[in-house]
Amino acid sequence: MRVALSVVGKFHTFDLARELAARNALEAIFTGYPRFKLRNEGLDADKIHTFPWVNTPYMGFPRKERLGNWAVELWEYLNCTTFDAHVARHMPPCDVFVGLSSSSLQSGRRAKAMGARYVCDRGSTHIRHQDTILAEEHA
């Protein structure tokens, strides 16, 4: 089985990548992180595909609050959609594609069109459910 992964940041997806690599099942992992930040991830460099052009400036910008909510939200949207489009354009042949829900709509469609199974990974529960749980706990 060949598995391709997509994550605009790092999160738990790199743990999954290491487990898949240990079983010779990792085809590729796409990330918005710059390559120099990934040297100690324990993965073969040829399996890591980076697209840091929007995410790195976003992460490094020290005063996002001065931009206003609309600008930050637009930047986050562009970060996810440009990354997703990049992954869709560079999708390798694979049996399974796992992408985080915020940035894998186009790439998930591309993977399915190529015959792969698509797993839309939601790293946490829905925000409405989180709010409900917190309200119950603090009532």
How would you describe each model-predicted region?
Residues 10-12, 33-36, 102-105, 123-127:
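Short, solvent-exposed loop/turn segments at secondary-structure junctions
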Residues 56-74, 114-139:
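Acceptor-binding helix/loop patch of EC 2.4 sugar-transfer enzymes
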Residues 38-42, 108-113:
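Short loop/helix-cap segments at secondary-structure boundaries that form the rim of catalytic
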Residues 16-19, 106-110:
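A short acidic, amphipathic alpha-helical/loop segment
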Residues 59-102, 139:
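Conserved nucleotide-sugar donor-binding subdomain of glycosyltransferases
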Residues 4-7, 87-104, 110-121:
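Short N-terminal targeting/anchoring amphipathic segment
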Residues 1-51, 88-92:
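N-terminal subdomain of nucleotide-sugar transferases
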